[in-house]
């Protein structure tokens, strides 16, 4: 996919993080209008998972050697 076409690990992680952040924003926009408790719980868990992935990518980026 698009991620594999990006050269360099740091650039790939930044690209993935942008996508993860976009998903978090979309979920946060949807949550106020979701009435179904099960759907809401699933979206909240998905948001937490994406936020954890963002944090993990940021930590990995912080450990990469400088270019």
Where are these regions (language model features)?
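Acidic/histidine-rich alpha-helical segments that form the ligand environment
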Residues: 1-49
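Amphipathic alpha-helical coiled-coil segments
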Residues: 53-64
């Amino acid at each position: 996919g698009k991620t594999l076409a990006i050269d360099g690990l740091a650039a790939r992680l930044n690209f993935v993080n942008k996508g993860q952040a976009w998903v978090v924003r979309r979920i946060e926009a949807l949550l106020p209008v979701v009435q179904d408790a099960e759907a809401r719980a699933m979206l909240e868990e998905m948001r937490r998972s994406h936020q954890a992935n963002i944090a993990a990518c940021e930590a990995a980026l912080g450990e990469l050697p400088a270019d």
